[in-house]
Amino acid sequence: MIQIDFNKMGGLIPAIIQDYQNGEVLMVAFMDEKTLNLTLETGKTWFFSRSRNKYWMKGEESGNTQEVMEVLTDCDADTVVIKVKQNGPAACHTGNRSCFYVKWENGQWVEHSKPLFDPAQVYKK
């Protein structure tokens, strides 16, 4: 039986979050064993924030949750791809559909999308 290898990165694995319909990469985050199990049990994506040192469910503040459609692991069992139905307009905390909205072009990084919501309004702190 395949076991996910959490040892290579100090208890964490990268989780690539992908739109299940069109294959767009929405975000990359980190999971530990607890958040992977929460994701598998609840059908919602859960992550471990390295900067805040806490667990979080995608959309818990914004309402832009992710419904898990399929989970895959790579040949080394140390990374997962989670295909999701994105509920709400955007996966990125900046308000963009994807966290990957900046493209290398003509020797510089260029933003290629506009936010779909105002983060200052959504994340009132």
UniProtKB/Swiss-Prot annotation:
Keywords: Amino-acid biosynthesis, Cytoplasm, Histidine biosynthesis, Hydrolase, Magnesium, Metal-binding, Zinc
InterPro entries with a match to the protein in the record: PRA-CH (IPR026660), PRib_AMP_CycHydrolase_dom (IPR002496), PRib_AMP_CycHydrolase_sf (IPR038019)
Reaction equations catalysed: 1-(5-phospho-beta-D-ribosyl)-5'-AMP + H2O = 1-(5-phospho-beta-D-ribosyl)-5-[(5-phospho-beta-D-ribosylamino)methylideneamino]imidazole-4-carboxamide
Pathway: Amino-acid biosynthesis; L-histidine biosynthesis; L-histidine from 5-phospho-alpha-D-ribose 1-diphosphate: step 3/9
UniProt GO molecular function: magnesium ion binding; phosphoribosyl-AMP cyclohydrolase activity; zinc ion binding
Subunit structure: Homodimer.
Protein name: Phosphoribosyl-AMP cyclohydrolase
Organism of origin: Pelobacter propionicus (strain DSM 2379 / NBRC 103807 / OttBd1)
Lineage: Bacteria, Pseudomonadati, Thermodesulfobacteriota, Desulfuromonadia, Desulfuromonadales
